[in-house]
Amino acid sequence: MEKLTILLLVAAVLMSTQALIQGGLDERQKAKSNFFSKRKSNAESWWEGECRTWNAPCSFTSQCCFGKCAHHRCIAW
């Protein structure tokens, strides 16, 4: 009976340890995927309508896909 109790305790400790480790890995994987998915390419931003192409009217640099607004037009350089 003692051996069975010890065996059950060891099994419970191992299972809880595995659950803790698995939970930590899931959080790290989510953080890593969020880090890589935050920034979009110029083409993706343009395709989704989040920025303006070359020679389009603009007021701010952030409106242009290429990141430059001069004389109220998006420019590439």
Curated annotation (Swiss-Prot):
Cysteines joined through disulfide linkages: 51-65, 58-69, 64-74
Gene Ontology MF annotations: ion channel inhibitor activity; toxin activity
Tissue specificity comment: Expressed by the venom duct.
Keyword check for Secreted: yes
InterPro entries linked: Conotoxin
Subcellular location: Secreted
Keywords, ordered alphabetically: Disulfide bond, Knottin, Secreted, Signal, Toxin
Main location: secreted
Signal peptide segment: 1-19
Prosegment location in residue numbers: 20-50
Any one GO cellular component localisation term in the record: extracellular region
Domain notes: The presence of a 'disulfide through disulfide knot' structurally defines this protein as a knottin. The cysteine framework is VI/VII (C-C-CC-C-C).
Homology family: Belongs to the conotoxin O2 superfamily.
The protein's name: Conotoxin S6.11
Lineage: Eukaryota, Metazoa, Spiralia, Lophotrochozoa, Mollusca
